[in-house]
Amino acid sequence: LLTIFSCTTSTDVPLPITTASEEALEMYNKAWYYWGDHDAIKQSEYMKKALDIDPDFILANLYVVENDPNKRKQFRDKAIQNKNDGSNAEKLLVDMFVAGREGRTNDQINFAKKLVEEYPNSSKAYVDLGDAYNVTRNFSSAAQNYIKATDINPENVNAWWRLGSQHINVYTNQILLPASKQDKKLGIKYIDKMISLRPEAAVGYQIRGNVDRANGDFESAKKWYTDALEKRRATGRAASGLLGVIAHNLVFNGEFDSAQEYYNLGISEGQTANNKYSVGIFQIQSYLFNDDYSGAIKVADQISNDLETYGFSPVQIYQNKAQIELRKFLAHAHNQKKEEAYESLMMRKNYSERAMELMEVDEVRQRDFDANNAQYQAWYHILFGEYNEAETQLNTLYSIVSKIQSPTALDHYSAMMGMVRLFQGDSEGSLSYFNENIDTENYQYYSYFKALALQASGQNTIAKDIFNKIANYNFNGLGVSLVRSLAKKQLESQ
């Protein structure tokens, strides 16, 4: 094995990388370049080329994008197995991954601090420490480390992206600063730096479009997305995700039929099974924004039927069918169709169980499986007014997630307890559960009910502000798709 140390004249000293092959290292570095363009397909392609040459390549096993859970676990297990054969940097990076997966966020931060202490001239080390802080919502510490990374290497496009992503919505499940602390001008400054570093890459133009979409300037967003699509086409990169983004913009601009054409195009152009499925999930949710529950269920059934033609493995088919049934359950439940909602809830659980049967189940997978079952069962009971049953499930959820170190581990439990107390007529008790983590940037669904509790307790100004943010939230997510129209109705009734 060779441990490659930097011979660069740059002030940015790459972390030492252990591999048996210079060619494998070249493929690995190409993968990271494409990751800077947010091209998961190319990242995966070149990481796997590196692994074809050197199957024991620690960091390639750790970072390769792989959507099949069994294959992904094989890669990560190989990284864990080999961590002591590499440099201390590689060991720390693997330890960070394990800690993050297990929810040991304090340990994750401490490992990252050691990485920075041992490799103070590596911009990547500071990005990794920033990421560890960001997960815990310690945004200022995260930003300080991202900025330090750009001080070391002004061309570290991943660091600029991290800085911009604190202020600008781009991806589902992205962690953003609370709306009151966001600075869109600063975010644009960071994204413009990305564009200057990678003018041929589509991602910067897409993010600029997202800024305009967030502000309700859908026509300006269209221009940015057109530029981004041209970049994708010119470089022969996958465009299905961007076609979905164009569709989102059309949904919020009231051009629903045109949006469906773009969703369909995104599915048909998907180069991977996951590309097709991801666009399909967004298409289901687009109907929920319009309270078209039957339309959402019709599309969900079609996508579920098509999954086997996408090229998924059996375990992925079951996992994805479970996610589709979750959306059907919520569509039925918000339409107050109890029998149908329960059927979809049980189908979701059944598909998840079948997926588990095809996986090597460790403690974390079992924990997450049990937590999801309790959470979704509680959700069902809440939406149909069965509050004692809901509390029983939430107590089960608490017994699972309270053992996780993460400061966000209790968020779903707390928010759902807040919903229970609200519907029981105890607005003050409800607000004691709706903590500061429940904000409109990261939990739009729960924020709607938090606003109802605030309104019931006489805090109308704060409640109205939350309703307004949700009603004008122009991004496609499951939770917000269920409450955006409800927030609009609250504003109209005042």
Segments and roles (model prediction):
Residues 20-49, 53, 91-114, 118-124, ...:
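Alpha-helical segment of the N-proximal tetratricopeptide repeat
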Residues 28, 59-63, 91-94, 124-128, ...:
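Alpha-solenoid helical repeat scaffolds
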Residues 40-41, 105, 139, 173, ...:
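TPR-repeat structural position
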Residues 48-53, 80-86, 113-120, 151-152, ...:
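Solenoid-like repeat scaffolds
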